[in-house]
Curated annotation (Swiss-Prot):
GO biological process: defense response
Cell compartment(s), UniProt: Secreted
Function summary: Shows antibacterial activity against B.cereus, L.lactis, S.epidermidis and S.uberis.
Protein name, per record: Uperin-2.8
Higher taxonomy: Eukaryota, Metazoa, Chordata, Craniata, Vertebrata
Gene Ontology CC: one annotated term: extracellular region
Alphabetically ordered keywords of this record: Amphibian defense peptide, Secreted
Amino acid sequence: GILDVAKTLVGKLRNVLGI
């Protein structure tokens, strides 16, 4: 669902930022 997609995008961003 949309929440799953949002969580995936946030996870990718966090990995890229190294947070």
